[in-house]
Every structure is written in C-alpha cells, then in structure tokens.
C-alpha cells in the first residue's frame, strides 16, 4: 500500500472518529461527514484511474454531487435548528416531535 492510499484511509478514519467523538454539535458532525465524503471521492478517483476503469469514471462525480446535496441539506437543517432552538446541540433535538 503506497503512502497516498494510506493517507486517504487515515483521513477517512480520522473523520469517522471525529463523527463519533464530536457529535455534540451538529456543525462539527457535518464537517466530519464532509471530510469523509471528500476522502472517499479522492480515493475512488485514484482507484478508478489506477485500474483504468473507464466505465466507472463518472462514479466520483456522482459521489461529489451527492456530497454537495448532503452539505446543502445539512446546512439548511442547521439554520432551521439554530433558529428554533437557539443552539446546535444534537442532544437537545427530539426527532419524534412534529
């Protein structure tokens, strides 16, 4: 395993660890999820170019589009939650309320 792949796997693991540790605030969770998606994007693009899979060349772009949609929805939820509750603590949210 070369150093680029090791660094990307390490970045994904650290972002996953960040999601598990910093889950008190919604903003920090969203930032860690974005780091996970970006490391997956780069890793997928490198694997596809390394194995010369031209049929799967659109997969990293599709992942990037879904990542942008996830970031947009997450930020919209963050604005709505901080406007209604006054903070972005995840523990104060009750998802069963209407």
Swiss-Prot record:
List membrane-spanning regions.
1-21, 31-51, 59-79
* Annotated GO biological process: ATP synthesis coupled electron transport
* Matching Pfam families: Oxidored_q2
Kindly list the GO CC terms recorded for this protein: mitochondrial inner membrane; respiratory chain complex I
Could you tell me the keywords of this UniProt record? Electron transport, Membrane, Mitochondrion, Mitochondrion inner membrane, NAD, Respiratory chain, Translocase, Transmembrane, Transmembrane helix, Transport, Ubiquinone
According to its record, how does it sit in the membrane? Multi-pass membrane protein
Where found, per UniProt?
Mitochondrion inner membrane
Gene Ontology molecular function: NADH dehydrogenase (ubiquinone) activity
**Catalytic activity reported:** a ubiquinone + NADH + 5 H(+)(in) = a ubiquinol + NAD(+) + 4 H(+)(out)
InterPro entries in alphabetical order: NADH_UbQ_OxRdtase_chain4L/K (IPR001133), NUOK/Mnh_C1-like (IPR039428)
**Catalytic EC class:** translocase
In short, the EC number is: 7.1.1.2
Subunit annotation: Core subunit of respiratory chain NADH dehydrogenase (Complex I) which is composed of 45 different subunits.
Give the protein's biological function: Core subunit of the mitochondrial membrane respiratory chain NADH dehydrogenase (Complex I) which catalyzes electron transfer from NADH through the respiratory chain, using ubiquinone as an electron acceptor. Part of the enzyme membrane arm which is embedded in the lipid bilayer and involved in proton translocation.
In terms of PANTHER family, this protein maps to: NADH-UBIQUINONE OXIDOREDUCTASE CHAIN 4L, NADH-UBIQUINONE OXIDOREDUCTASE SUBUNIT ND4L
Family as reported in the entry's similarity comment: Belongs to the complex I subunit 4L family.
Write the protein's name: NADH-ubiquinone oxidoreductase chain 4L
This protein's encoding gene: MT-ND4L
């Amino acid at each position: 395993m070369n150093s680029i792949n090791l660094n990307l796997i390490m970045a994904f693991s650290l972002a996953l660890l960040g999601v598990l540790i910093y889950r008190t605030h919604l903003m920090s969770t969203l930032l860690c999820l974005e780091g996970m998606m970006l490391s997956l994007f780069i890793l997928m693009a490198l694997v596809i170019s390394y194995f010369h899979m031209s049929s799967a060349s659109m997969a990293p772009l599709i992942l990037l589009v879904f990542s942008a949609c996830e970031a947009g929805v997450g930020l919209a939820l963050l604005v709505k939650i901080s406007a209604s509750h006054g903070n972005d603590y995840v523990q104060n949210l009750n998802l069963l309320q209407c």
